Amino acid sequence: MSRIGKLPITVPSGVEVTIDGQDVTVKGPKGSLVQRIAEPITVEKDDDGAILVKRPDDERNSRSLHGLSRSLVNNMVVGVSQGYQKDLEIHGVGYRVQQKGSNLEFALGYSHPVVVEPPEGIEFATDGPTKLSVKGIDKQLVGEIAARIRKLRRPDPYKGKGVRYAGENIRRKVGKTGK
């Protein structure tokens, strides 16, 4: 039995879960999300309001999808009730970020400013010229947008300059030694 998949999902107050066949819809104070669950897995509501994710058999495919499906539904419940946030930091001389409306404008050492537009359901917030955060209800989308921003100028292993996640440790390399 999957250690993650067998755990029931508690639904906080103010969150409504609707199960329609393989489609699970979660509505909460921050918005609503829809997820289609893979075929052998079933999602049911318990008598006390908890959500149970079950698998029909112990085949390899069912086992692999069991924990995944439970995590996807749990991430939806947490997203519509609390939301997700990913913080990023910018290191380097002259590297900075500026909020222009809902967009972010980066100065990252290129000959031009880099503008990033938020997709639907994502908000950007800046805290000074070197700190920013990506917020939203969809965990996958928040992580993807944060990774795209980090990819604009990945941290340099020699000087540590670039965009990194808050608290991320960059493995530094020693430069070549002169004679």
Curated annotation (Swiss-Prot):
The keyword Transit peptide appears for this protein: no
RNA-binding in keyword set: yes
One Gene Ontology term of the molecular function aspect: structural constituent of ribosome
InterPro entries, sorted: Ribosomal_uL6-like, Ribosomal_uL6-like_a/b-dom_sf, Ribosomal_uL6_a/b-dom, Ribosomal_uL6_bac-type, Ribosomal_uL6_CS
Keywords, ordered alphabetically: Ribonucleoprotein, Ribosomal protein, RNA-binding, rRNA-binding
Function: This protein binds to the 23S rRNA, and is important in its secondary structure. It is located near the subunit interface in the base of the L7/L12 stalk, and near the tRNA binding site of the peptidyltransferase center.
Listed HAMAP family: Ribosomal_uL6_B
Assembly, per entry: Part of the 50S ribosomal subunit.
Record-stated family: Belongs to the universal ribosomal protein uL6 family.
NCBIfam families for this protein: L6_bact
Entry protein name: Large ribosomal subunit protein uL6
Organism the protein comes from: Saccharopolyspora erythraea (strain ATCC 11635 / DSM 40517 / JCM 4748 / NBRC 13426 / NCIMB 8594 / NRRL 2338)
